[in-house]
Amino acid sequence: MDSWIFAILPLLIGWLLDLLLGDPIWLPHPVVWFGKAIAACEHKLNRGNFRKAKGAFVAIVLIALVFALSWFLRRLLLPLPSYLLLLFDAIIIFYCLAGTTLIREVREVFLALDRSLDEGRQQVARIVGRDTSELSAQEVRTAALETLAENLSDGVIAPLFWLAILGTPGMLAYKMVNTLDSMIGYKTERYKAFGCWAAHIDDIANYIPARLTALLMILATGKLGRLRFVWKNGRNHASPNSGYPEAALAGILNCRFGGPHYYFGQLFDKPYIGENDRLLTTADMKKAVRVNRTAEVIMVILVLLRSIL
């Protein structure tokens, strides 16, 4: 098999599998195992003194273990028939991409909201960390679209970025970074010490991908003038990264994101992204999905070119 074909096939196979299947509930997923490992460490170590140091130790060790284990497995496969390594990498890529599942979940939020506000609240609670019990219909739509933008970075662009930089071990290690942040990277009383290093590492790992995501979203619309809106409003977020893809989508849809939210019973007064507080519709969701898919295709092409050059 020509080397350039071998270089691009794992990504093509893994990406196409994600497009076709998403994350089937019947298929075991590494992120579930990551979550169990994080939960076990947090339960055992997030108590007493030195919580910040213990949290840093847990984050660094788990990330390093995932990288080392996947690197070692690839080394074991090198002397064997080449298709085995190709399949291994393709499966890792498939597991690390979450674009299709995210889009399905956001569509389900809008469908549920058409049935009732309560169903919409319950559905959006599956994909956001905030308290959804008292959200209005507009706030449910806003939360879903914010998550669609933010997780284009976390679930697609950032994994592909780290694939291009460090191969499948780096891609899988990034998923551990992201899972750590999603589970313990909160500024609540329980997690603010133990999870602070998980949050810092996630901020570093997503610094370039988040901004790249915003750029790709704007490129997907062909209206580069909106970049000024992104750079102005991307900083209006508690996260140093999440605001950029959210600002890109707010600029594309000419709407307003952000604002105060409840997380784990605590009110977080987040700034607004954008100024046009207009009614969001299913048409906006469909447009956002098209933007996500186009940005994803551009990124896949860039990584494919990187792999053969």
Question: For each predicted feature, which ranges?
Answer:
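Substrate/ligand-engaging "lid" and interaction regions
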Residues: N178
